[in-house]
From Swiss-Prot:
GO terms for cellular component: cytosol. It is an enzyme of class 2 (transferase). Pfam families: CTP_transf_3. This is 3-deoxy-manno-octulosonate cytidylyltransferase. SUPFAM superfamilies: Nucleotide-diphospho-sugar transferases. One of its GO terms (biological process) is CMP-keto-3-deoxy-D-manno-octulosonic acid biosynthetic process. The keyword Oxidoreductase does not apply. Belongs to the KdsB family. The keyword Ligase does not apply.
Length: 251
């Protein structure tokens, strides 16, 4: 998207305090700042539009606000990040000025701003409802690991796939690259509105993959190919790794 589209793009970052593996995750200190603030900084550095953090806890709200970022309180009852960002969207942009919504997960403090920008590129095609990201799988263990979500897609260019399916299985069969899905999404506003109105689908429940709801409803998802998977912070070990990465960048 060009600079003229900045007013049309809203970057929303959902943050939940209830993490079983890393309690209080949004407020975990990384180089002197809460993790959620580090994520907001990366999103701001992407320079694609307004950045708003969607929270469910007053401590997180206060920390984000103190850092100078826009923040909105949302319900703690949401079952998914998509539901949380939709509530945030209706609160911060009730007039519908934002045409494109980018959902950046709140546990990606080291993400490259260029990776955030890449999620928007598929929406340059008017036929695409949702843009997301992938990278080719190099590690042999990752090719069969159920926690690594794979994309079955048809190439539309050297750097983009048209998603046909997402699965935890090893797919597609046969020779050729396998692709690791990166859960960062860019939606057309109408697509997000439709998505949250649909409710969980059959394949979504079976694979525990929310994006299958869109495919089952006939929505088009295109996938930009990027170089690396951003570090998601889910455990204390991930947190230490994130601290080392950002310390090296700032040191």
């Amino acid at each position: 998207m060009s600079d003229s589209n900045l007013d049309e793009v809203l970057v929303l970052i959902p943050a939940r305090m209830a993490s079983t593996r890393l309690p209080g995750k949004p407020l975990a200190d990384i180089c002197g700042l809460p993790m959620i603030v580090q994520v907001a900084m990366r999103a701001k550095e992407a320079a694609i539009g307004r950045v708003v953090v969607a929270v469910d806890d007053q401590q997180v709200f206060d920390a984000v606000s103190a850092a100078g970022f826009d923040v909105v309180m949302t319900s703690s009852d949401h079952q998914s990040g998509s539901d949380r960002i939709f509530e945030a969207l209706t609160k911060v942009d009730p007039d519908g000025k934002a045409k494109f919504i980018v959902n950046v997960q709140g546990d990606l403090p080291t993400i490259d701003p260029q990776t955030v920008r890449a999620a928007l590129r598929p929406l340059e095609n008017e036929a695409v409802d949702i843009g997301t990201l992938t990278t080719e799988i190099d590690d042999e263990d990752d090719k069969t690991a159920p926690h690594i979500v794979k994309i079955v897609g048809s190439p539309v260019s050297d750097t983009r796939l048209h998603a046909l399916y997402f699965t935890r299985a090893t797919a597609p069969h046969g020779k050729g690259p396998l692709y690791h899905h990166i859960g960062l999404y860019a939606y057309r506003r109408a697509a997000l509105e439709r998505f949250v109105s649909l409710g969980p689908s059959t394949l979504e429940r079976r694979e525990s993959l929310e994006q299958l709801r869109a495919l089952e409803a006939g929505m088009r998802i295109d996938v930009e190919i990027v170089d690396t998977v951003p570090l998601g912070v889910d455990t204390p070990a991930d947190l230490e790794k994130a601290r080392r990465i950002l310390s090296a960048r700032t040191g």
